[in-house]
Amino acid sequence: CQNCHMPQVEDPVKIAVGYTALLGRSPFNLHTFAGANSFMVDLIRRNKDALNIIASEANFDSTLAATNRNLRYNTLNAELSDPDFFNDSVGFELMLTNKSGHKFPSGYPSRRAIVVFTLTAENGDTLFSSGNFDSSGEIVNYGGVVEPHHDVITSENQVQIYEMNMGDVNGDFTTILERASVHLKDNRIPPLGFTNQHASYDTMRVVGAADTDSDFNKAGSTQGTGRDIVHYRIALNGYTGTFKATAKVYYQAVPPAWLTEMRTLDAPEINSFLSMYDEAPNIPALVAGDSLSELINPLHIQSLKIKSPVFYPNPTRASAGFNMQFQLKPEKIRVYSLSGQEMPLSWKKNSDGTWHINLSAAAGTYLVSVEVAGKRFTQRILLIPD
């Protein structure tokens, strides 16, 4: 727990005073605890006078900063696969890996993690969107009931929400702890090594469709991967241009729908809290994300007037590498000597949308081959001595 939730120093620290012979211990965890509920910390900060809280603004700011760092860097990893195209549709796999030592999200059952997946056209128009929030912090088109776990998402009305939902004695959804009797859903992502063979599994079961999802905490017949893979299958509806795919995972501590039952009750404490809640910005916290840009359906590549790539500077010094301007994301870049030998290289995208190519080669003339969607473009480039 300390490794993630408390900052660590490697220098030896004496853990008591008045003992000159006491040896320092290393590593030492500082007495600063970072959880995940930045929303409630901020709500208390905004109402600290009414709540008679004496902590300073600086204390709140440092706690919020530590909490947000913990969420962003110690919680989850998101990796979006290269697309698969099926006629007029596209498929992606989003792999989410739990980096913590417990289920994510964990703690009080109001907490949830939402996947926001978006396809955006080259002109900025939205081609597909699942999981977006409105100004109140609620998911668009969310009905306030149990959203099933999804292995495959094909519609904007399907949203992947990782959460634990409670049911009362009648099996109806409830947010009141005293009425909770059964689990209706628990697809929170387990930690690495979690299996259903543990002696305490009955108290922390995977419940609902996630239990039969073939890649939820599984790789074939092996359990304990600590990850889930969400499959997106999206119709392009005849769109022929380039597009961008973006996946982001957000954490939300107190969703608006969680307070629906509370709003039917009347008590000074409840009314005070609801007033504070309604005035606080309920902005979910970004936990992880990934994106792919300049994607295009190979079936539509012929409809584009693709210009040959432009390499510059040309000539260029052998140690400096060179840049490439090209309207699509290249699938392969290869460089050959005039004798046909393939040369080692690396390439990355520049901030201005061009590509930089580093080449391990002596001075001379080389052929640069760029491939995208079955097309190949070849040009010469001259490397001069440094």
At which residue positions do the language-model features occur?
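A glycine-anchored, Pro-Gly-centered beta-turn/N-cap motif
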Residues: 241, 353, 362-365
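Short, surface-exposed loop/turn segments at beta-strand-coil junctions that are enriched for proline
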Residues: 235-240, 360
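Short coil/turn motif common to extracellular beta-sandwich-like domains
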Residues: 87-91, 314-321
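Residue-level detector of functionally pivotal "anchor" positions at catalytic/ligand-binding pockets or at interdomain
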Residues: 293-312, 318, 327
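Short beta-strand segments within Ig-like beta-sandwich modules, predominantly Fibronectin type-III
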Residues: 345-351
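Primarily the internal scaffold of c-type cytochrome electron-transfer domains
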Residues: 1-214, 219-225, 230-237, 245-296
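C-terminal tail/sorting-segment detector
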Residues: 320-322, 341, 345, 358-386
